[in-house]
C-alpha cells in the first residue's frame, strides 16, 4: 500500500487524510507549526470528523518526526494554512515547500492544493528541484490541484507529464473528477474562473451604492445580490490577489483584475459605513448600542482571508461601538451559541446583529424565534444589498427598517 503524507494542519488537509485513511491508505498528517507528523488511522478517521476534535489527543495518537514521514511518502498532498499578510504569503508558502523538498524521496508526487496564479507552477517546480536535488522529469511528479474553500473539490487538475494510472486511482478515492490538463492550462482555467466570479460581483458592489435600501433589495432579488455575503466574498481573496499579481504588466486584464481587487477589498469598509448610516437614521447612540458580529470563520481552513477580514471588521466596529461581541453557529467554532445568546440577552441595550453568512443568520434567527426571547433586535445581513430587518419582543415577522 502506498504511503501518503498530507502536509498542512488544515480543514481541507484533514478531509483528505481522513478520506484516504478510511479506505485503508497509510496516512500521516504534518502539523507545520508543531513540526510533528500524526498517523491518521481508519479508527481516527471514523471517530474524529473535524480537525479541532483531533487537538489535545496526543496521548492517543501515533506521532513521528516530519522528516521521517516525508521520507516514506510516495504521495504528498500540500495543503498548509496561509496566515501571513498577503505580501508575505509567498515567502510563507515557499518556506513550507522547502521543508517538503528537503525531505521527499525520489519518485514522490507532490499535489499542490493552494492557488498559484499564472506561471506559478514554474517557480514551484524550480524550488522543488533546487532544494531536493531531483529532476521533475525523472525524480518527482507535480500536480496542480487548487481546492475550493473548505472542500476537497479541486477547480482543476494540472500535470507536468502524463500521469500514472495509480495516481488517477488515488484521486478517484478522493472524488477528484476534473479532466486532466497541463499545468499552464490548469492555472489559466483557475484564473479565469476566479476572475469570472469576482467580475460578476464587483459591479454589483459598486452599483448598489447608488440605491436606497428597498431598491437594493428589489434589484438584489433579480441579480442574486441577496445570496452573496461577506463570507463568500472573502473566501477566495488569496486566489484573486495571486492572479492579479501574476498577470503580464500593461495587459488590459491587469487593470480589470486590479480594479476588481480594489472593489472587493473595500467591502469591509462598506459594511462599517452601512452600520454607521443605519445607527444615524435610527438615532442610536454608540454608547447605548451593543453590536453582535454573528459570523462563523474556520481558523483551520487553508486560506486565511476570511479569518483576517473577520478580525479587521471586528476591530473597525470596536473603534466605532465599544460594546461588541462575536458569536458563531458553525460546528468547528469554539464559540458556543447557547452561551453567547444568554450573554447577549443579559444586556438591556439595543442589539445590532450583523450576520456574515446566510447560515449564520438563519441559525441565530431560528434560535431566537424558537425560544421566544424578549428583546429588540436589528439584523443586518452583510450581503451585497445590506438587507436590514428589525424585530421587537417575540414577534419575528420582520420588515425592512
Where are these regions (language model features)?
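Rossmann-like NAD(P)-binding element
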Residues: 53-112, 332-375, 379
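NAD(P)-dependent dehydrogenase/reductase Rossmann-like domain
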Residues: 228-229, 257-401
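NAD(P)+-binding Rossmann beta1-loop-alpha1 motif at the extreme N-terminus of oxidoreductases
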Residues: 1-53, 59-68, 289-325, 392-400
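Well-ordered, non-membrane alpha-helical segments in soluble/globular domains
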Residues: 88-98, 124-127, 306-317
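Rossmann-fold dinucleotide-binding core
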Residues: 14, 79-80, 96-98, 102-186
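Structural motif
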Residues: 8-11, 31-33, 79-81, 113-116, ...
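Interdomain hinge/lid region at the active-site interface
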Residues: 187, 197-289
